[in-house]
Amino acid sequence: MSVLVITGTDTGVGKTVATAALACAARVAGIDVAVCKPVQTGTGPVGGTGDDDLVEIGRLAGVDALHPGWRYPDPLAPVAAAERAGAALPTRDELIGMVRAADAPGRLTLVEGAGGLLVELGQDAVTLRDVATELDAPVLVVVAPGLGTLNHTALTLESLAAQHVPCAGLVIGAWPAQPGAAEIDNRDTLARLAPVRAALPAGVGSVSPVDFERISATAFDPNWLAGLL
């Protein structure tokens, strides 16, 4: 299996856009890529308008192999969203089975979590870290550039190391057009914690798919992409 799990240090750090950028870069590099979103909250009522991360990833990345999982209307943590919907969370086996079903020989399968690394995604308090451990998959961490990111990032990396889950590196999800001293210093420090694989421009999720492809294709090192398979 060639599975890469993607998490974020916080809500709103750009995890979905980073997943789309990586998927787009892989596609441009000639890699067969699929994207899984095992648990999605905030989808809104049936027929209404809510968040749909996979639709956004498909629109931006030009990737068709999109695999949705369990969806809940309210924009809450999965446990709370499932309770409010009167629906069950998936079991560990269901989560793992979904990813394995999406993967294929020669394919890179990206798995985007919901929230951070230790947010409960399934029954019996299963987390994204548990999923990565079960799949023997590395984890790419999407981080913010500003104040607070060093502590959040270090805590996430420490949590991965505690369960011997390899970190595939960091992606800065929204690099400002005019970074200040904090952002510049943080970028250097983040690179000492783990390799920074890309720093995506803030607002890149709002550009056209053509521009998104151009930006994504140059954001990631092609040699690193090839090594993910």
UniProtKB/Swiss-Prot annotation:
GO molecular function: ATP binding; dethiobiotin synthase activity; magnesium ion binding
Location (main, coarse): cytoplasm
GO cellular component, as recorded: cytosol
Keyword Acyltransferase carried by entry: no
Reactions mediated catalytically: (7R,8S)-7,8-diammoniononanoate + CO2 + ATP = (4R,5S)-dethiobiotin + ADP + phosphate + 3 H(+)
Keywords, sorted A to Z: ATP-binding, Biotin biosynthesis, Cytoplasm, Ligase, Magnesium, Metal-binding, Nucleotide-binding
Residue ranges that the Swiss-Prot or TrEMBL entry lists as coiled coil: none
Subcellular localization, as worded in the UniProt entry: Cytoplasm
Amino acids binding Mg(2+): T16, D53, E112
Entry binding sites for substrate: T41
Active-site residue numbers: K37
Associated pathway: Cofactor biosynthesis; biotin biosynthesis; biotin from 7,8-diaminononanoate: step 1/2
Enzyme Commission number, as recorded: 6.3.3.3
Binding-site residues for ATP, renumbered to this chain: G12, V13, G14, K15, T16, V17, D53, E112, G113, A114, G115, P201, A202, G203
Matches recorded under SUPFAM superfamilies: P-loop containing nucleoside triphosphate hydrolases (SSF52540)
Cofactor (UniProt): Mg(2+)
Gene Ontology BP annotations: biotin biosynthetic process
Tagged with keyword Magnesium: yes
Xref: HAMAP family: BioD
Task of the protein: Catalyzes a mechanistically unusual reaction, the ATP-dependent insertion of CO2 between the N7 and N8 nitrogen atoms of 7,8-diaminopelargonic acid (DAPA, also called 7,8-diammoniononanoate) to form a ureido ring.
Recorded family membership: Belongs to the dethiobiotin synthetase family.
PANTHER family according to UniProt: DETHIOBIOTIN SYNTHETASE (PTHR43210:SF5)
Record note on quaternary structure: Homodimer.
Name listed for the protein in its UniProt record: ATP-dependent dethiobiotin synthetase BioD
The species this protein was found in: Mycobacterium sp. (strain KMS)
Lineage: Bacteria, Bacillati, Actinomycetota, Actinomycetes, Mycobacteriales
